[in-house]
Amino acid sequence: MAFGSLSSLGFGSGVLTQDTIDKLKEAEQKARIDPYTKKIEENTTKQKDLTEIKTKLLSFQTAVSSLADATVFAKRKVVGSISDNPPASLTVNSGVALQSMNINVTQLAQKDVYQSKGLANDGGFVNAQLNGTADLTFFSNGKEYTVTVDKNTTYRDLADKINEASGGEIVAKIVNTGEKGTPYRLTLTSKETGEDSAISFYAGKKDSNGKYQKDINAEKIFDDLGWGLDVSASIDPDKDKKGYGIKDASLHIQTAQNAEFTLDGIKMFRSSNTVTDLGVGMTLTLNKTGEINFDVQQDFEGVTKAMQDLVDAYNDLVTNLNAATDYNSETGTKGTLQGISEVNSIRSSILADLFDSQVVDGTTEDANGNKVNTKVMLSMQDFGLSLNDAGTLSFDSSKFEQKVKEDPDSTESFFSNITKYEDINHTGEVIKTGSLSKYLNSNGGNTNGLEFKPGDFTIVFNNQTYDLSKNSDGTNFKLTGKTEEELLQNLANHINSKGIEGLKVKVESYNQNNVTGFRLNFSGDGSSDFSIKGDANILKELGLSDVNITSKPIEGKGIFSKLKATLQEMTGKDGSITKYDESLTNDIKSLNTSKDSTQAMIDTRYDTMANQWLQYESILNKLNQQLNTVTNMINAANNSNN
């Protein structure tokens, strides 16, 4: 606050000036404000250095977490006998069983492809003389698609109608081949590969009674396209779910076919060149005919890299810890966090866990060189990790990989101590009462029941595929029952009879919110991936769908699991480092508040002091003026008397 300029304490004494007040204020600020400023700067520096340490600590924690996670040991790599342009490729997910396989591809899956005869104009009419309409029916994958044309329908319109009716399952296009005179052709291509995707034709459609009726106008349209139907075969479209082929084989330019290959000598057939049902987490892609061997191996590269990341992160952390906690006895200088127990204990806590010895289940060789199960004591020194004189870690990757290869199971147990898996507990959707009545034999007579074709319903567990289309004696399985509960129980019994170790199926009753029915429940020990595959419609009737459940290991207390917990005690919400950081923040906030209030008090005091002395000086100036007036009067009187 400004009150004017205070020059001196009246009468020219010069005792109290503004400069004197400023010096008094500066001295008090130095005594009372500077300690706050210094402490705030010290805490801010501590917090900055602590933030750097926390960042390094979190990087180290990330490296530890990856080694505490058992999935790092489940990583796999595939080594193929042919690397350039192989006949097949294999990819696998983590956890797939280590194995070798021989694949011999003898035939690739193909789509079905037809082309019409040459057309002069892509916008020409299919049949300009057509009276009324004509119905053309196409079949593929057991489904039928009927399109209706009239005299105004062009070839492009026909292609669009086929695409729309089939929902893209049959792809129709008008292509320009460049042929003279008739450069355009209508082509049909099945969306998917495989024999079941084969396209067939019927000149007509199904009537209101469900009977197929021929249409001579449709026959003419097919003939005009070059697709005259070969009706010599005995075909029942309703029963066979397919129509006729064409007479002109030259216009059937590619025939739908399944892929054929052998897996370790076993003949296999698939509708696609991408095979995903050989085992959970495995995808085989067929590229061309030929033979190739695959070896699924443990991927040590990922574990080795994780170890090196751990070492690098720790050494980076130690560099920051040394700078922040160092003390030089000769110079007396010390790091900003020297003497802070929460920080000083970081290194010792980490090393205590990291180099702790632990007894785990492992193997050893007996006198005859045979491996026998036993308890073994391990430490990180056994895996190539050591602490050098500088206090940093060193890592011998070759020693590490050799030790892991010797006994991967004991390594996994030592690192993360995974001893069990989450149980599998999968329950299907509700099968509402009455939804399976068409398969029942309620009167004790014959019944069609529900038959599964190969691949309609399969279960994959412990890397084995179980096809439910067959009984244990190899005969075809038919699902029957007098009641829906009995029918479903027969299904559960059939699955359980497969002897799938670790997996059980049961039927559960359901009665909630006025909905009654049953559900199928699958339970297991969770040590293997579990999947259900098959025909979507059949599975849906049974309250199921394609599903893949990956086994989930439960984390134990191996070396890195324990170290992970220790680090969490430092960096977690209630961790020691977190709490210390919060205390610094609170201290800085409190110090700033005290500093501001003290500064305000000092400012008020010296503003008041300056104001008071200005008032004193004003009074003294008035008195001085009065004194001068009296003095002048006296002097004037004296002069007049003289």
Swiss-Prot record:
Name the InterPro entries on file: Flagellin_hook_IN_motif (IPR010810), FliD (IPR040026), FliD_C (IPR010809), FliD_N (IPR003481)
**From which domain of life does this come?**
Bacteria
Location comes to: Secreted; Bacterial flagellum
Output one GO BP term: cell adhesion
Q: What function is annotated for this protein? A: Required for the morphogenesis and for the elongation of the flagellar filament by facilitating polymerization of the flagellin monomers at the tip of growing filament. Forms a capping structure, which prevents flagellin subunits (transported through the central channel of the flagellum) from leaking out without polymerization at the distal end.
Family to which this protein belongs: Belongs to the FliD family.
- Put simply, this protein is called Flagellar hook-associated protein 2
Organism of derivation: Campylobacter jejuni subsp. jejuni serotype O:2 (strain ATCC 700819 / NCTC 11168)
Provide the gene name from the record: fliD
